[in-house]
């Protein structure tokens, strides 16, 4: 996979999802504060409430103070900084001790109404001493965190890179905010933003002729597909997202499934659902570098997928229903589990081929390329009318709501980049970034700090 990384020509942004799910302190700190406050108000003796309130405030302030540094350590360590990776077990242990303290509060609070005054005083004293121990542990951890960050030369930089597109970022955030609102109202699966018509590539490894590293190659998996992000209901997480990819067999090639069917309507084949937790790297390259075709210069958005132990319930269901572990897909029209040995996928914007604009010689060259299913670059056309985009926009309630809001502000849709190019890879990129950010911290992007947003949006 190092060979693939060496071919990446533009910037990359890393998502430390696996670490943050286990070690994030912000969520644990807020839970402790809520449970502690509830215990003080409902179960603690009045004589102990003042002292308990003091240690609770100190604990909450300490956790809030170290959370930005802990988040920074997790992100940098996940990117391969060996000097900070040694701190990750310390952070995990601190998180475990906070969870233990939370369970201890629940244990002492259970049946408190039946306890005698002496037992209630004893329970409050135990909680007070346990909180003091946790505070001392946090205070001992702070110098180690500061020393490691200073030694590694890591700082909290909130300045955004020049490559960040403010317009695309605002458009993606608008989609995300509308979908969050609809999700809170319906509590059902909600699509995030528009559908993107893309060509899907996947990587595979094969033994090299020498004893060197594996030879990593790419193949075209779906010549045409509809990709979208959806927010799903999760029992363990407030924010949980899935990348859905539906193959469209109406791609200009011969398929038995499309015989006798109208060419204007989509004919769906295989389906993929990939948990966003598996995404660890997001980067741009060009299709020719993946497929060893020098003439191909189309931009491609590449995603690295990791195998995580704490898979979501959706992933477990897919794994249990898999019919053939040696095949990344199961029967057509079934939701399938993306096979764990596929480390990368790449997405290229799909273009229709306009037969009227292709000469005979060009048609022969194009057919030669398209006939090679393993290394073909998909159908393309540089002329797509705005009517197709307008139809795509009007089909989504969230997009209609945006259009209505723009109309109320007297903004002309015809002059909007968003309306003239809703299926661009850059919009998909920012949707993936923001959704991953919300799933990472389990809070809305509107509630995040500058450092949290900058750490995810900045490229390295």
Swiss-Prot record:
Superkingdom per UniProt: Eukaryota
Record's GO cellular component, any one?
A: nucleus
Which InterPro entries is this protein grouped with? Ran_GTP-bd-rel
Spell out the molecular function terms from Gene Ontology. GTP binding; GTPase regulator activity
Similarity comment text for this entry:
To yeast YGL164c.
Record-given protein name = Uncharacterized protein C31A2.10
Species name for this entry?
Schizosaccharomyces pombe (strain 972 / ATCC 24843)
């Amino acid at each position: 996979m190092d060979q693939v990384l060496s071919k990446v020509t533009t910037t990359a942004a890393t998502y430390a999802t696996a670490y943050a799910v286990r070690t994030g302190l912000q969520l644990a700190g807020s839970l402790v504060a809520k449970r502690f406050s509830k215990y003080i108000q409902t179960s603690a003796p009045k004589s102990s409430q003042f002292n308990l309130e003091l240690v609770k405030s100190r604990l909450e302030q300490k956790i809030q103070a170290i959370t930005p540094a802990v988040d920074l350590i997790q992100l940098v360590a996940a990117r391969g900084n060996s000097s900070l990776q040694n701190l990750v077990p310390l952070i995990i242990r601190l998180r475990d001790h906070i969870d233990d303290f939370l369970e201890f509060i629940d244990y002492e609070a259970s049946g408190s109404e039946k306890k005698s005054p002496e037992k209630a005083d004893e329970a409050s004293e135990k909680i007070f001493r346990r909180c003091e121990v946790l505070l001392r542990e946090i205070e001992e951890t702070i110098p180690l965190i500061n020393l490691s960050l200073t030694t590694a030369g890591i700082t909290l930089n909130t300045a955004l890179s020049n490559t960040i597109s403010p317009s695309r970022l605002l458009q993606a955030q608008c989609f995300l905010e509308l979908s969050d609102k609809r999700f809170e109202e319906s509590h059902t699966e909600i699509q995030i933003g528009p559908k993107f018509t893309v060509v899907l590539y996947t990587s595979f490894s094969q033994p090299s002729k020498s004893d060197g590293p594996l030879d990593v190659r790419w193949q075209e998996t779906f010549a045409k597909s509809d990709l979208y992000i959806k927010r799903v209901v999760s029992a363990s997480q407030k924010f949980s997202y899935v990348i859905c990819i539906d193959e469209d067999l109406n791609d200009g090639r011969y398929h038995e499934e499309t015989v006798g069917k109208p060419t204007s309507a989509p004919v769906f084949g295989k389906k993929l659902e990939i948990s966003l937790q598996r995404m660890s790297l997001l980067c741009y390259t060009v299709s020719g570098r993946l497929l060893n075709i020098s003439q191909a210069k189309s931009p491609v958005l590449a995603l690295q997928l990791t195998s995580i132990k704490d898979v979501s319930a959706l992933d477990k269901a897919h794994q249990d229903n898999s019919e053939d572990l040696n095949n990344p897909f199961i029967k057509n029209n079934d939701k399938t589990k993306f096979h764990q040995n596929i480390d990368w996928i790449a997405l290229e914007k799909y273009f229709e081929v306009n037969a009227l604009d292709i000469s005979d010689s060009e048609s022969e060259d194009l057919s030669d390329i398209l006939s090679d299913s393993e290394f073909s670059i998909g159908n393309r056309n540089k002329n797509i009318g705005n009517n197709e985009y307008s139809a795509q926009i009007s089909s989504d309630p969230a997009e209609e709501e945006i259009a209505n809001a723009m109309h109320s502000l007297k903004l002309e849709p015809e002059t909007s980049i968003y309306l003239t190019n809703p299926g661009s890879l850059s919009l998909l990129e920012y949707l993936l970034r923001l959704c991953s950010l919300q799933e990472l911290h389990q809070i809305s992007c509107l509630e995040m700090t500058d450092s949290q947003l900058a750490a995810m949006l900045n490229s390295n």
